[in-house]
């Protein structure tokens, strides 16, 4: 997973290619809804494993069947290639 800093144009271009993700300030954000808490927690466990593999961890929260995920690269105080790569992997779950 590349830790490449992106220009604003590159960020906007890649964000436009992702479904249901949106740019919020310096973060890439998405909400996920599941049948119930157990399914939401199973999803979070899978995301945690992906995040550990990538050594890149989301800001997230969970309330019952909803999981909010925000991705950012603190090193750049912006969205980087790592965030887009992780978002795409999360979308494959």
Predicted regions and their residues:
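Helix N-cap motif at beta-to-alpha junctions
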Residues: 36-37, 76
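Short amphipathic alpha-helices within nucleic acid-binding modules
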Residues: 38-44
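C-terminal structural segments of small proteins and small subunits
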Residues: 67-93
